[in-house]
C-alpha cells in the first residue's frame, strides 16, 4: 500500500483499466456528483464524461480507479471508488484529470493517483498535462509538491440573456449566408474547417468523425442550434450551441436551472471575412435567447486575447477558471 502525507497509509488500492464495467461507471458518476457538490465545480471535462460508458474503448485512453481498502472484501458487496483518474490524449502527449472523494481527501489518494499517472508515461516518457477544474488551492499545492508547473488557464465566461442584457444585431460579411448544420452531409466539411480554425489548439483541432459522432449521439445535440456559414458554397465558419438542462456551477445564492453554451465557434482562416466570428456568436446567442434561456456560458483560453476581447466586448465576464499543470519530470522537495 502506498503512503500518503507524513507516512499515513493510503486507504485505497489503485487499478488501471482499459474499459469500465456498468458498476464502475455508476460508481464514478456518483463520485463526480459528490465532488461537484463539495467543490462547486464539475471535477472533469466533457471529454472525460463521454468515455464513461460500459465496455467502451476510446483510443489510447485508460482509467485509474482508487478503490476503498477499508470496506468489505471482493467476495462481498462492491467496495466504493474513492478516487478516479482518466489518462487520455495521444501516446506522446497525454492529458489527464483527477478526482478524489471529498470524504477521503488528505489521505494521499490524490498524490498516489498523480504519481501513478507519471509512472505510466513510458520510456522515454510522454508529455503529461493534468487539468484541475475550479483552480482550487489544494490542487495547486499538490501540483507544486509533485513537480507540475501551471501552464494554461481556461476561463469559463458568462453573460445574461434577455431584456436585462440586449444583444446587438449580427452583421455578416458580404456574400456570407448562414444555415443549420445537416448531420451526415456537413460532417467532413465541418471537420476540415474545425481543424483549420483550431490548428494550434491541443484538443479541439484534433477532432475526428468519431468525436463528432459521440456528441451527435448525446441527448443535448440539436442541429437547429448548430449554425454553419457559407460563401460560394464553401463552409467558412460555424457556431455550435448547446443547452444544459441544469447549470452545474450556478452563481452563489441562485437555484440551478437550464443554461445555454457557446459550445464552439470557428472561422476558416482567411476565408470568412472581418467580423464573421462575432456575427456567428451573436446568431447563436439569439437562438439561445429565443429558446427561453436566461444565461449563457463559454470556455476560452486566457491567452487567446483576441477571443477574450471579443467576448468581453459582448458583456461576458469570468465565472470560473480551470488550470492545466504540466509535469516537469521530478517532484519538488
UniProtKB/Swiss-Prot annotation:
Catalyzes the transfer of acetyl from acetyl-CoA to desacetylmycothiol (Cys-GlcN-Ins) to form mycothiol. Transmembrane segments: none annotated. Its EC number is 2.3.1.189. GO terms for molecular function: mycothiol synthase activity. Monomer. The gene is mshD. 1D-myo-inositol 2-(L-cysteinylamino)-2-deoxy-alpha-D-glucopyranoside binds at residues 46, 203, 242, 261, 299. Belongs to the acetyltransferase family. MshD subfamily. Residues 18-170, 176-333 form the N-acetyltransferase domain. Acetyl-CoA 2 binds at residues 265-267, 272-278, 304-309. The lineage of its organism: Bacteria, Bacillati, Actinomycetota, Actinomycetes, Frankiales. InterPro entries: Acyl_CoA_acyltransferase, Bact_Acetyltransf, GNAT_dom, Mycothiol_AcTrfase. One of its GO terms (biological process) is mycothiol biosynthetic process. Signal peptide: none annotated. It catalyses: 1D-myo-inositol 2-(L-cysteinylamino)-2-deoxy-alpha-D-glucopyranoside + acetyl-CoA = mycothiol + CoA + H(+). HAMAP family: MshD. Acetyl-CoA 1 binds at residues 98-100. Keywords: Acyltransferase, Repeat, Transferase. This is Mycothiol acetyltransferase. It comes from the Bacteria.
Amino acid at each position: 500500500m502506498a503512503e500518503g502525507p507524513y507516512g499515513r497509509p493510503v486507504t485505497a488500492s489503485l487499478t488501471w483499466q482499459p474499459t469500465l464495467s456498468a458498476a464502475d461507471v455508476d460508481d464514478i458518476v456518483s463520485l463526480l456528483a459528490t465532488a461537484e457538490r463539495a467543490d462547486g465545480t464539475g471535477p472533469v471535462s466533457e471529454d472525460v464524461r463521454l468515455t464513461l460508458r460500459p465496455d467502451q474503448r476510446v483510443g489510447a485512453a485508460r482509467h485509474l480507479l482508487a478503490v476503498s481498502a477499508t470496506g468489505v472484501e471482493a467476495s462481498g458487496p462492491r467496495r466504493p471508488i474513492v478516487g478516479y483518474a482518466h489518462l487520455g490524449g495521444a501516446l506522446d502527449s497525454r492529458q489527464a484529470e483527477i478526482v478524489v472523494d471529498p470524504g477521503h481527501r488528505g489521505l494521499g489518494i490524490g498524490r498516489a493517483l498523480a504519481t501513478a499517472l507519471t509512472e505510466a508515461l513510458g520510456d522515454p516518457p510522454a508529455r503529461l498535462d493534468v487539468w484541475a477544474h475550479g483552480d482550487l488551492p489544494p490542487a495547486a499545492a499538490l501540483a507544486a509538491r509533485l513537480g507540475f508547473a501551471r501552464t494554461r488557464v481556461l476561463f469559463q465566461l458568462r453573460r445574461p440573456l434577455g431584456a436585462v442584457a440586449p444583444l446587438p444585431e449580427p452583421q455578416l460579411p458580404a456574400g456570407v449566408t448562414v444555415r443549420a448544420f445537416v448531420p451526415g452531409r456537413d460532417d467532413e466539411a465541418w471537420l476540415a474547417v474545425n481543424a483549420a480554425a483550431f490548428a494550434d489548439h491541443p484538443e479541439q483541432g484534433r477532432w475526428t468523425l468519431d468525436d463528432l459522432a459521440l456528441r451527435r449521439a448525446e441527448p443535448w445535440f440539436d442541429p437547429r442550434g448548430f449554425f454553419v456559414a457559407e460563401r460560394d458554397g464553401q463552409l467558412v465558419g460555424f457556431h455550435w450551441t448547446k443547452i444544459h438542462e441544469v447549470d452545474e456551477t450556478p452563481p452563489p445564492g441562485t437555484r440551478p436551472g437550464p443554461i445555454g453554451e457557446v459550445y464552439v465557434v470557428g472561422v476558416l482562416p482567411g476565408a470568412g471575412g472581418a467580423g464573421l466570428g462575432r456575427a456567428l456568436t451573436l446568431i447563436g446567442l439569439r437562438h439561445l435567447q429565443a429558446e427561453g434561456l436566461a444565461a449563457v456560458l463559454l470556455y476560452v483560453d486566457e491567452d487567446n486575447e483576441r477571443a477574450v476581447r471579443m467576448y468581453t466586448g459582448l458583456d461576458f465576464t469570468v465565472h470560473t477558471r480551470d488550470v492545466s499543470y504540466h509535469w516537469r519530470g521530478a517532484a519538488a522537495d
